[in-house]
Amino acid sequence: SDAEQLKKLYFEYLTAFPPTEEQNMETWREMIREFYDNEFIKLLVCEVDGIVVSTVHVTVIKNLTLNLRPYAVIENVVTHGSYRCMGYASALLEEATLFAKSHNCYKVFLETGSNKESTLNFYRNNGFATGLKHSCLKKLP
């Protein structure tokens, strides 16, 4: 199922420190159902021959400023190593941007934990500017 494939994709290519506790797949499936039922969340996946090879998670957040226009946050952009540089993640980022536009968002916000120039260039090539704002992160236990 998509849940098992997403878990594998995340843990192999995205998460530097996979969870030490066993992940309940029914919880994963339920969360994915909740995402699909929520008009402000999109969990986008790209499949090739029935295999999930890329994914992007986008959430629209309501806002009290900028004429009450919401903004969107993109997280968990990941592509299987064997399927990179084939346009899959770019297509999903475009779909995420269209989703944000459909909600009248004034911006799409994306952070990456990577400092690799190739990763930053990938985002720049997909319309995301770097160096315009400063991001602050507080990790919680």
Regions found by a protein language model. Name each.
Residues N63-I74, R84:
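A conserved beta-turn-beta hairpin within the catalytic core of GNAT-like acetyltransferases
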Residues F109-T119, L137-P141:
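Conserved beta-strand-loop-alpha-helix junction that forms the acyl-donor binding cleft
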Residues L93, A100-T112:
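Conserved GNAT acetyl-CoA-binding A-motif
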Residues L43-V45, I51-V60, V78:
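Conserved beta-strand in the GNAT
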